[in-house]
Curated annotation (Swiss-Prot):
Name assigned to this protein: UPF0410 protein YmgE
Predominant localisation class: membrane
GO cellular component: plasma membrane
Coiled coil (UniProt feature): none
Compartment annotation: Cell inner membrane
Species assigned in the record: Escherichia coli (strain K12)
Record family assignment: Belongs to the UPF0410 family.
Membrane-traversing stretches: 1-21, 27-47, 58-78
Membrane topology according to the record: Multi-pass membrane protein
Pfam families recorded: Transgly_assoc
Amino acid sequence: MGIIAWIIFDLIAGIIAKLIMPGRDGGGFFLTCILGIVGAVVGGWLATMFGIGGSISGFNLHSFLVAVVGAILVLGIFRLLRRE
């Protein structure tokens, strides 16, 4: 059950990133899911690597904000790569 909860957590982060950065990316809901999951993983990895805020674990506001920032970063990179 834990992995499903994390996927839902990351999906919500992806949806919020999409609301913050609206636009037509193609892929629809599926792309939002993938970018949210990848973004949350990237955000958690970067936060841990740079020592931002200590440990990223559990379902809390800090972990969620890191996931949203990671999803925004991945969405921005995705858009830059699609434009070229």
